[in-house]
Amino acid sequence: PKDLRTARAAGDIGALLAVLAGVETGHVLQQVGQAFAEVWEHGAGPAKRRGRRSVEQELESATMNLSNALSWRDGAGDAPLAAELIARLQGREPEGRPLPVDLGVLAETMASRDDAGNGAYLDLDTGAVLPVAVIAEYGGDPESGVEELGIEPGHEWIVLDDPAEATDADRRDFARALSNGSTLDDFSAGEALNRAMKARGAKNFHDVLDERGLVAVWRTFQGDRRWGRAREALAAQGLRPVGSARSEGPEKSEESEGSAGSAGPGEPGESAESEGSAGPSH
């Protein structure tokens, strides 16, 4: 949500804790974890309306709880994020070269599919993100420069791609999370999604999402998984995301940021047309 992004950008401890107070965050651990990482990166920011030490103690406690939740879930990208949060608590610099990249834009662009090319180009010098398909349209090579896009030569770029099979895995995990949920509605929805994935008839996965009012929940679930895969891809390159840079990826919506306040199974946030944007947890 917008308030979470605002707290992240400001590095405001009090605002971050207020946004998350009483909210179930198990479905958005990557996105909430990134907000915490950026607050720590900013030196723990201004604490308003309460004693600073009290707020810092709240931050430390919440950071430890979040690191534990990430370690328990153990999905793609959860281990490096948990380790980063622990390093902050211990007063150490986290592992990885910091790169000012917008992790949400990178995750979404990595998942983009186009006849001209799949995935994202990432500038290892600036953190800028561009869809491979956009570069392909100009027939250029970003390392040689693409004048029409304002890309100067001499930077090092790599291609990062979210595996096509990841979507099927996300669907199965989403259905499983609902089936293991705490209510009969969760269980019923999970079983309906499992049947839809196995059936060859007209009623498919997205029909069930729409009928059950779970489209936003699915977006959030899949989005958080994509953030994790993007973080893991960066960690494999020895990189650590620390904030946003100029990016030319797919335009982000309010929902692509994920929604800390909108869900886990039972409430949990992709559209039926596109496989994603920004999820319940494991």
Regions found by a protein language model. Give the residues of each.
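Helix-boundary capping/turn motifs
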Residues: 8-9
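Short alpha-helix boundary/capping elements
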Residues: 40, 44, 198-201, 213, ...
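Contiguous mid-protein beta-loop-alpha structural module that forms a pocket-lining wall or clamp
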Residues: 28
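The feature captures two recurrent sequence modes
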Residues: 2-5, 15-22, 31-163
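Acidic, proline/glycine-rich low-complexity IDRs
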Residues: 217-249, 280-282
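Long, intrinsically disordered low-complexity tandem-repeat segments
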Residues: 247-278
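Amphipathic protein-protein interaction modules
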Residues: 167-226
